[in-house]
């Protein structure tokens, strides 16, 4: 069987080897001698594969799943998520599709100047640095090695994992750069860009081989590529191949594309999907259905949405049940522990003391109109996804909470909870509503020595994505399967406390995916590839304007779901343990409070609502100032109702009023939201290839400079 599979793979490589790129890749490609040495034994192959995993960890951390391009584009460029500071840097130009493809902004944008990324640190360089190494393995592992009685299974697994690694790298390259160079063997010398449709076809062929060679997923091997990962990646790539993307018309012939009827071409690029898109959905359906029905060591908790995130915050070595692939981090390690995701898009913290979580920047923030007006108040995911408080600790009284200042607190003890006010300070006490899914307070033992070393893993692929991808494919394939779409949509929908639904549509699935992955950076790409980006951006802009106009006119605005945002909210310092709560890190919001416009009736309720916040249970809370540490948490009132009189014992905080102020001062919340884009032009959601990547006669498309 392995012999047959490898034979198919070798034939496929011969047929689908594509003309590829230039000097940049040619000079970084390994030699034939190196390939022979690396694949001369199982140990040599495994060492090469292990090195690729380490390189992929760097790419995930620095560019495609935490920092870099993920931080610039995915984490903050949708109707749900946005950046928290003023639009004064290069990354914010990219967030808005370069002000709708403004020719001056697009043509002058560079990765080095606008994103501060050196040529050798770009996603392009990091991912293309991995691909030639994988070509060593796929070129060097022979049919005879696969069939070896003693070592054949090991060679087969490494071969399959190498195919998965190449496919993963190309998937990310296409997502961020569009049409790129294809290099699938050691003999490929880049001479031209290759249409992403041809690359997708090659990846699909490779993954059909890999899924039969990779080992079965178990609870213990989720940090490596497995059979279930190969199937899920095949489904993910097939979905994207079927989807709307912005294509260079000088690379992909227009006859192969079906243009989106609502979007105009721009900069010799068109927003379209392949004419045979349904065939890709057929492939996605089969692949994702396999994983859904054969999850191996992955397990979906159908009752509790928080299980996955609780497990992510476990001790080193803890892998979430729902994960299919996690990038592992080790707490405190300067190499594997340098995890950027909790820092970049986690719950914000400003701290300068060992008795508090380390600084978390919290660059990705939640659009307030989405939080208030789009999330169903009954949805259990809202308060896990979106958080209105951060952690704060600084010596002295600068920025200290009013109640602590009055109590004479000197700022030298433990972290305390603060409101994330709507100012331009991206930190533990500003820039508005943030993502609450990655919160170092929730770790069993937070790391306090240095920021960015929490050890929290990065969840790259999990079952809920498989389920919702399957629901999408079921609706869009050649012969739609409504029953399967309903079944897998309802697995996540019901878990969120929203019951079940029949006859779901593609837009239902896209929206469900938005709620399921809110604050995780999935939304932007999902809206782009499903064709809903213009509709959803227009809707959130209109809702934001209504909110701001209402706040200006009346001091409050009430949304259709019953939630009200007012000019002010009110807080009070509390000690949860003195109120009978078991922890300072609060539980999910009690279901009885998950209704539109809920107002807490007691201080205890105001501490529990909204849930999933608070502070870590530092032992020092019990000993500081003879056991009289100032109150660590806050009770909140007026978050979803309009209260005009300050409740007894509470302090008033500008809330909606601060949104209006920022809009009047710098246009941040409405005017800058996808500033300049008309929701009708092909979205330029990509970034240019940097100068070194274009050596050899290549040119950027989409209006970007080519350094010529």
Predicted regions and their residues:
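Short coil/turn linking the two alpha-helices of tandem helical-hairpin repeats
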Residues: 174-176, 181, 218, 237-249, ...
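Bacterial N-terminal signal peptides that target proteins for export
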Residues: 1-8
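Flexible, polar/acidic helix-loop-strand segments at domain edges
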Residues: 98, 105-110, 374-462, 695-708
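Extended glycan-interaction surfaces of carbohydrate-active proteins
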Residues: 204-207, 213, 403-454, 526, ...
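C-terminal motif of bacterial Sec signal peptides marking the signal peptidase cleavage site
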Residues: 17-20
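Conserved, well-structured interaction surfaces
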Residues: 41-50, 54-60, 64, 89-177, ...
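Extended, compositionally biased alpha-helical segments that mediate assembly or anchoring
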Residues: 588-708
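An aromatic- and glycine-enriched ligand-binding surface/loop that stacks and positions planar moieties
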Residues: 22-105, 208-209, 228-231, 236-415, ...
């Amino acid at each position: 069987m392995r012999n047959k599979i490898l034979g198919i793979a070798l034939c496929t490589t011969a047929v689908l080897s594509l003309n590829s790129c230039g000097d940049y890749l040619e000079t970084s490609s390994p030699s034939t001698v190196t390939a022979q040495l690396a694949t001369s034994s199982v140990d040599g192959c495994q060492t090469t594969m292990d090195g690729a995993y380490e390189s992929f960890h760097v790419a995930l951390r620095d560019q495609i799943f935490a920092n870099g391009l993920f931080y610039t584009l995915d984490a903050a460029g949708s109707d749900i998520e946005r950046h928290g500071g003023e639009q004064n840097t290069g990354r914010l130009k990219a967030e808005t599709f370069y002000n709708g493809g403004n020719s001056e902004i697009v043509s002058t944008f560079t990765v080095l100047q606008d994103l501060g990324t050196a040529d050798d640190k770009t996603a392009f360089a990091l991912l293309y640095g991995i691909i030639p190494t994988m070509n060593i393995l796929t070129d060097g592992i022979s049919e005879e090695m696969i069939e070896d009685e003693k070592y054949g299974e090991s060679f087969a697994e490494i071969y399959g994992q190498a195919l998965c690694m190449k496919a993963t790298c190309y998937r990310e390259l296409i997502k961020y750069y569009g049409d790129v160079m294809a290099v699938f063997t050691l003999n490929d010398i880049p001479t031209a860009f290759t249409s992403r449709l041809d690359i997708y076809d090659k990846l699909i062929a490779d993954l059909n081989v890999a899924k039969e060679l990779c080992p079965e997923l178990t609870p213990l091997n989720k940090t490596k590529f497995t059979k279930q990962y190969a199937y899920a990646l095949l489904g993910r790539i097939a979905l994207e191949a079927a989807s709307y993307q912005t294509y260079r018309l000088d690379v992909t012939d227009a006859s192969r594309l079906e243009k989106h009827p609502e979007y105009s071409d721009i900069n010799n690029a068109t927003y379209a999907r392949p004419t045979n898109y349904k065939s890709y959905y057929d492939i996605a359906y089969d692949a994702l259905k396999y994983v859904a029905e054969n999850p191996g060591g992955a397990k979906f908790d159908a009752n509790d949405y928080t299980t996955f995130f609780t497990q992510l915050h476990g001790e080193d070595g803890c892998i979430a049940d729902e994960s299919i692939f996690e990038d592992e981090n080790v707490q405190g390690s300067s190499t594997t522990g340098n995890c950027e995701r909790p820092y970049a898009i986690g719950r914000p913290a400003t701290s300068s003391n060992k008795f508090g979580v380390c600084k978390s920047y919290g660059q990705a923030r939640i659009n307030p109109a989405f939080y208030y007006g789009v999330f169903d108040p009954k949805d259990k995911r809202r308060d896990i996804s979106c958080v209105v408080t951060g952690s704060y600790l600084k010596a002295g009284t600068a920025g200290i909470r009013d109640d602590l200042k009055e109590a004479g607190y000197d700022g030298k003890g433990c972290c305390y909870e603060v409101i994330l006010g709507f100012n331009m300070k991206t930190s533990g006490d500003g820039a508005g509503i943030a993502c609450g899914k990655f919160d170092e307070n929730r770790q069993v033992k937070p790391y306090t020595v240095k920021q960015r070393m929490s050890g929290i893993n990065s969840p790259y692929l999990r079952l809920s994505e498989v389920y919702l991808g399957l629901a999408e494919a079921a609706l869009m394939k050649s012969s739609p399967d409504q029953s399967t779409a309903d079944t897998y949509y309802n697995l996540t929908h019901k878990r969120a406390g929203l019951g079940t639904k029949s006859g779901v549509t593609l837009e239902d699935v896209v929206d469900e995916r938005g709620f399921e992955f809110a604050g995780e950076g999935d939304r932007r790409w999902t809206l782009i590839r499903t064709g809903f980006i213009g509709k959803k951006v227009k809707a959130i802009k209109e809702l934001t304007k209504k909110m701001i106009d209402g706040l200006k006119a009346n001091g409050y605005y009430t949304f259709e779901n019953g939630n009200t945002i007012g000019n002010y909210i009110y807080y009070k310092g509390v000690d949860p343990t003195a109120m009978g709560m078991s922890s300072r890190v609060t539980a999910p919001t009690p279901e009885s409070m998950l209704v539109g416009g809920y107002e807490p009736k007691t201080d205890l309720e105001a501490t529990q609502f909204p849930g999933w916040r608070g502070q870590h249970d530092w032992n020092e809370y019990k000993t500081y100032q003879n056991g009289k540490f100032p109150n660590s948490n806050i009770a909140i009132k007026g978050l979803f109702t309009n209260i005009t009189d300050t409740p007894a014992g509470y302090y008033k905080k500008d809330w909606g009023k601060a949104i209006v102020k920022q809009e009047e001062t710098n246009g941040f919340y409405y005017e800058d939201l996808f500033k300049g884009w008309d929701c009708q032009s092909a979205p330029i959601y990509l970034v240019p290839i940097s100068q070194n990547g274009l050596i050899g006669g290549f040119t950027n498309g989409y209006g970007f400079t080519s350094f010529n």
